[in-house]
Regions:
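Short, Lys/Arg-enriched N-terminal segments with co-localized hydrophobic residues
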Residues: 1-16
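Pepsin/retropepsin-fold aspartyl endopeptidases
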Residues: 14-189
Length: 189
């Protein structure tokens, strides 16, 4: 194409100008540790799923109640995968109920809440459906509506936000009842 002065346009400049008009998106992996500060969860491992539209949080023992005429839900969360040792209790206002189709094709009516999510130092509101994800690989699923226009997903990598520090297990103390070590070396006379 030519501009008004019959000169060729530099395609590289056009692409560069187009990139400048869009905010730069940060990259995240297909697995990330996210925080849900409003729910008291410092870190929960989430699967970043570009194939899922909505986001879901593992929740069980759901009890609905009214607070000043508004529907709320109280629930429990096991934030760590493959263990029920730690339980967090939380409550949130119910935004609505939504019919969600699982990856197996089954539909389920789930309560939807809005809460803050934190990833790579960025905090924003996200809609979460509450469902029992005990049998699923991840306690949280972050669907594309949650990260759209905020992040690009590198499906081949994980944990761009880092991983939480693991607590070191204390080394076992030597048992005082143990027999002293025997030296089996022999010396010749």
């Amino acid at each position: 194409k030519r501009d008004d002065q019959n000169q060729y346009l530099d395609f590289g400049k056009v692409v560069s100008m187009a990139k400048q008009s869009k905010p730069e998106l940060r990259v995240i992996g297909w697995r990330e540790w996210v925080g849900l500060p409003d729910l008291g969860i410092k870190k929960i491992k989430a699967k970043v799923d570009t194939g899922a539209r909505s986001s879901s949080l593992h929740a069980f023992d759901l009890h609905e109640f009214e607070k000043e005429g508004v529907k709320w839900v109280r629930f429990k969360i096991h934030p760590l995968q493959r263990t029920a040792k730690r339980t967090i209790e939380a409550s949130a206002e119910i935004l609505e109920y939504r019919t969600v189709r699982s990856s197996s094709g089954a539909t389920q009516l789930r309560p939807v809440i809005v809460t803050q999510v934190e990833l790579l130092g960025i905090r924003w509101p996200v809609e979460l459906t509450l469902a029992n994800r005990d049998e699923m690989g991840f306690r949280m699923l972050l669907g594309r509506e949650a990260f759209r226009r905020r992040f690009l997903v590198d499906a081949g990598n994980s944990f761009f936000g880092g991983q939480p520090k693991r607590k070191k297990k204390p080394k076992p103390k030597p048992n005082s009842k143990q027999q002293p070590a025997v030296n089996h070396t022999t010396s010749e006379p």
